[in-house]
């Protein structure tokens, strides 16, 4: 039933996105200006028609199936119940897409929870030749470094189900920080533009895959 519902939803609500709400104590609501700014940029630059007021959706909710893409971020702990993990798994294998932005502190928690969702699938680094880096905007060197916490190189990881990328995880990039209002982190305009361009690539890929 959920698989059928998703196929209907993706055609009916193809211009809607949501922020993923989760338990565990982490701040799923971090970067409140990020998604609205990304939506505005995408609507202007890749001709999407996304609602300017994104909603939040819980991991275990059937409403998850209304959205072709959901965004997840935070700094701390993440916890999925078995039912939530199953709901997210069905959503992803049925055509949904999850973007996770490591807001520095999320990594050690989200990796454990993703194993609940896909016990037999490992996160893999995505090659720069992958279409997600080559939509309207080309990133032939991979993810841009947005927020410098250390000297680690930014990496894009993914979960692939039957050859299809269902989850994109930006690690050590802090991509969603670059989507926020300029006054929040004082990132240079050039850095913010790169972040928004990569973000719009993610949306474009999720909508057209």
In which residue ranges do the predicted regions lie?
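Sec-dependent N-terminal signal peptides
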Residues: 1-12
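Aromatic-Pro/Gly-enriched surface loop or interdomain linker
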Residues: 13-69, 73-76, 166, 174-175, ...
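Short alpha-beta junction capping motif
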Residues: 17, 69-108
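Solvent-exposed loop/turn segments at secondary-structure junctions
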Residues: 22-26, 75-79, 97, 104-108, ...
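Sec-exported extracytoplasmic/periplasmic mature domains
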Residues: 43-47, 93-96, 115-119, 207-208
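Surface-exposed patches in mature extracellular/periplasmic domains of secreted proteins
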Residues: 49-57, 100-103, 121-129
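Short, surface-exposed beta-strand/loop micro-motifs that present aromatic residues
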Residues: 59-60, 151-167
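Acidic, glycine-rich loop-and-strand cores that form catalytic or ligand-binding grooves
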Residues: 112-143
